[in-house]
Amino acid sequence: MCIRDRYAADRVEHIAKDLLPRLESGQTVLCDRYYFSNFAYQTLTSDLEDLLRYNAFARRTLRPDAVVFVDVDPEECARRRAHRGGAAEFYEKTELARQIRTGYQQVFDRLKTEEHILIVDGSGGPDQVEARIWSALQGYFESGVNEEITQP
C-alpha cells in the first residue's frame, strides 16, 4: 500500500469514526486541513487528478460546507517562526512552504466550482486575520446558506 492509499484510508476512517457520528448528533465540526491538505502536500509527488480519484469516496461521503484557507506568504511564515523561536519543522522550511502553497492554489483552482473555498489574507496581526475570517464566513452564510454563525 503506497502513502496515497494510506492517506485515503485514513480519511475514510476519520469520516466514519469521528466526523459523521458528531454531525449526526447535531454537533458543529471544524476541521483543520481535511482532504485539501492531503491534496496540496501530495501534489508535490503525485498527479492531482489521481489524488482526486483515490479520495473520491471521502469527497462524496462528506464535503465541508466551507473551506477557509488562511493564505500567508512563506516569507512571512518564516518571520513568524523566527519570532516564536525554536527550530523549524520539516514542512516549515520556506522553499517547501512555497511548493505547498502552490499545491493549495492548484487544488483550489481545480475545485473552485465544486467546493466553497474562502481564501483569507493571512498577513497582519491575529486580530486582523480573525476579523477577515469572520467576515469571509459571514459573507458566505449571508449568500444563501441557511445557517447562522456567531463569534465566540
Briefly describe each language-model feature range.
Residues 75-152:
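NTP-dependent small-molecule kinase module
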Residues 38-103:
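A glycine- and Lys/Arg-enriched "phosphate-lid" helix/loop adjacent to the NTP-binding pocket
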Residues 20-21, 58-60, 109:
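Short secondary-structure boundary/capping segments
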Residues 33:
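Walker B catalytic acidic pair
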Residues 7-29:
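Phosphate-binding/switch loop-helix module in NTP-utilizing enzymes
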Residues 25-27, 64, 116:
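Short coil/turn segments at beta-strand junctions that form active-site/ligand-binding loops
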Residues 30, 66-68, 118-120:
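Hydrophobic/aromatic beta-strand patches that form the interior of the parallel beta-sheet core
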Residues 1-3:
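Short, small-residue-biased leader/transition segments that mark boundaries at the very start
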